[in-house]
Amino acid sequence: MGIAVTCDFVAELLHLSHNMGQSFGIPAEDVVIDPLVLTVGADSKAGWVTLQTIELVRREFGTNVNLGASNVSFGLPERHTINQAFLGLAIGAGASCAITDPIKLSLTVRALDLLRGRDDFAGRYIKQFRDLSALEGK
């Protein structure tokens, strides 16, 4: 079996896994699903399939979603730009955590929190900016 390339196939696997977890009494809040991010350099629909899968997981199972966000840009130039855009879309779709470069994308995450109304008076965004500026100054 190859890597799943459609949201429907992934959904089928997730339903099987979810049912198995429930049969063992594992609550949804203790489950973290990783939808396997593939590079858009090899499949232009890979990012979109992942975003659809994230939405499906949050809607149907209510579990946490983890993803290797930087996989999406593998083999492409200006990976950081692609990663930033994808991370914003993934968080909007419902991703709860990401495996990524914490220094390069931490300010992006803070900006997303700010724009989603989760950072009163931009306090965390400004603090992160200052912390990163201090690191660069060393």
What are these regions (language model features)?
Residues 1-136:
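Catalytic alpha/beta core domains of metabolic enzymes, predominantly
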